[in-house]
Amino acid sequence: MRRFKGAKGIVLLLIFVLVGIGFYYYLSDRIEIEQETEIDLTVVQELLLKDLDKKYPPSPKEVVKLYSELTRCFYAEEYSEEELYDMAQMSYQLFDKDLANHNPFDNYYAGLLKDIAYYKDNSYIMTAYTTSSSVDIENAKFEKDGYTCTKVYCYYTMRYATQITTITEVFVLRKDESGYWKIYGWDLVDENE
């Protein structure tokens, strides 16, 4: 092979250096453009990015927190019809198979739409929620029909015009065959009892 000597060698070396510098600037500009085009997601969109098939909530408390955040979004956030449907499907994934069998998705979704309309028509807004402590949840575990179950209390803060009230619900969760905690049912707690 012949070597380039003299002017030809210098010109080729200069071309390679310029191509390398150009490629470097091309890549660095591209990275800056990608960083600038990050999209600000809404609370609903961030929630819908969760893939429960790959990363299911690990504890009863986390299941109720996710369900409650979805519920808060139903009554307090802006979303499209498609996002509403996707949130409903996500909350339905948290249901135990027995609850899902007694309340098919179409019935659940129709009831949810009515509830949302009622809350919006009457200007109710869910502003916050808190759940039982992990220790209380651990102490509430019990066995039923061969399943491990537990109770989780959730306290919802609701605003109606200038009034603020707290609603307490008790959730019963059951560990399924895959080891996932699923919502078996829930009920309002009568504060007078």
Task: Label each region the model flagged.
Residues 10, 89-94, 167-168:
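Short, charged low-complexity linear motifs
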Residues 2, 30-42, 163-193:
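Short beta-strand edge/turn micro-motifs at domain boundaries
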Residues 23-34, 48-57, 133-135, 169:
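Phosphate-binding glycine-rich loops and adjacent basic patches that engage nucleotide phosphates
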Residues 1-45:
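Amphipathic, hydrophobic N-terminal targeting peptides for secretion and organelle import
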Residues 20-26, 47, 89, 103-110, ...:
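Short low-complexity stretches enriched in small and charged residues
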Residues 112-160:
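Surface-exposed, charged secondary-structure patches
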Residues 43-123:
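Core segments of small alpha/beta cavity-forming domains
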